[in-house]
């Protein structure tokens, strides 16, 4: 089991975690909305749209990794 963390350390870690997750949500949301708009307007899907979808998936993958790391940390603390 890891060393006891102070309440302040836990709060700072949680704040950073939430900040990182929020950033990735904004990226995934924004990029996917651009592509959705293109699809709704029946415009052809271009390389830029593919890049946006890739960025969206990358952001989701990063969130998944952050959640797994956080879950591991919390299991170590309990």
Task: List where the protein language model places each region.
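Histidine phosphotransfer helical core of two-component systems
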Residues: 2-13, 24-78
